Amino acid sequence: MKNIGIINCGMGNLHSVSNAISNIGFNPVIINASKDLVSFACSALVLPGVGSFDLAIDRLEKKNLIEPVKLWIQEDRPFVGICLGLQLLFEGSDEGSKPGLKIFNGYVSQFKHSLVKKVPHMGWNKLYFNRFNTIDNLVPHYFHYDLQPWAYFVHSYYIEPKDCYTFNTTSLTFYGKQKIVSSISYNNILATQFHPEKSGLFGLFILKRFLSSY
């Protein structure tokens, strides 16, 4: 059984992600330090989180996990970012002053009250897929342009990429008048603004198909 490392930032959804990983047939292991990546011989990494951008970066720094996580991604090893874990892949956030992991160009912005009903964006919302993206290479037969599944969201900030050509925008979501990039892919990265671990069978399917590909 493959070990799937779940990075512990102490930011919310560790338990539910661990249960989801177990339910789809993998062995979840909690990563608290860089040495855990080696000792657990992880096949993939998951970076979950809900809450403060700066606090998450601060905790990764204190656990000396910033560079190991960046190296893992740079080596094209399987990586899943969930909610805050997606946002941390970018340069920084309106929420604070700390730099992100800078895997992608762009920043994380707060919802504008003039465009949305209320903040945070919490609950179920529909995903829209682009028929010309390459998500079928990652989770074939389901993530497809003519299917519009629903997923569960909890967030007050959203990513604003500078250069969408550096990765594949695999799905969009609309909240009020605001368009949200709700999932992206790049090489061996799958990152979602929604919570697959809380999105029922659809969310579990996404995780299983991606993690089973490696």
Curated annotation (Swiss-Prot):
Record's keyword annotation contains Kinase: no
Coiled coil: none
Gene3D superfamilies per UniProt: 3.40.50.880
Pfam families recorded: GATase
Main subcellular location of this protein, as a coarse class: plastid
The reaction(s) this protein catalyses: 5-[(5-phospho-1-deoxy-D-ribulos-1-ylimino)methylamino]-1-(5-phospho-beta-D-ribosyl)imidazole-4-carboxamide + L-glutamine = D-erythro-1-(imidazol-4-yl)glycerol 3-phosphate + 5-amino-1-(5-phospho-beta-D-ribosyl)imidazole-4-carboxamide + L-glutamate + H(+); L-glutamine + H2O = L-glutamate + NH4(+)
InterPro entries documented for this protein: Class_I_gatase-like (IPR029062), GATASE (IPR017926), Imidazole-glycPsynth_HisH (IPR010139)
EC number: 4.3.2.10, 3.5.1.2
Entry's Gene Ontology BP terms: L-histidine biosynthetic process
Subunit structure: Heterodimer of hisH and hisF.
Name assigned to this protein: Imidazole glycerol phosphate synthase subunit hisH
Organism: Cyanidium caldarium (Red alga)
